[in-house]
């Protein structure tokens, strides 16, 4: 199973996180499948590769709680619902 998870980067007392698609069994700093975003909590900046995130979410990837909060703020889940077909 694949998760969208934060991967810590940066230096001491100055954490910066990458949002990555990674296998559940891998460690936090393990090999990721793809880098799909960036989050800097100090400067409060985010960069999201929305097409890549939507691809992994459509394939069944589960975001962690923190990543889910970041995606909600960016309104990525609204785009996910728009891409899904409607059934009558």
Swiss-Prot record:
One Pfam family it belongs to: Ribosomal_S16
Coiled-coil segments on the chain, per record: none
Gene3D superfamilies: 3.30.1320.10
Location(s), subcellular: Plastid, Chloroplast
Induction (record text): Transcribed and spliced in green leaves.
Cellular compartments per GO CC: chloroplast; small ribosomal subunit
Repeat is among the record's keywords: no
Biological processes per GO annotation: translation
UniProt xrefs under SUPFAM superfamilies: Ribosomal protein S16 (SSF54565)
Recorded superkingdom: Eukaryota
PROSITE patterns per UniProt: RIBOSOMAL_S16
Keywords: Chloroplast, Plastid, Ribonucleoprotein, Ribosomal protein
GO molecular function annotation: structural constituent of ribosome
InterPro entries: Ribosomal_bS16, Ribosomal_bS16_CS, Ribosomal_bS16_dom_sf
HAMAP family: Ribosomal_bS16
Annotated family: Belongs to the bacterial ribosomal protein bS16 family.
Official protein name in the record: Small ribosomal subunit protein bS16c
Organism, scientific name: Solanum lycopersicum
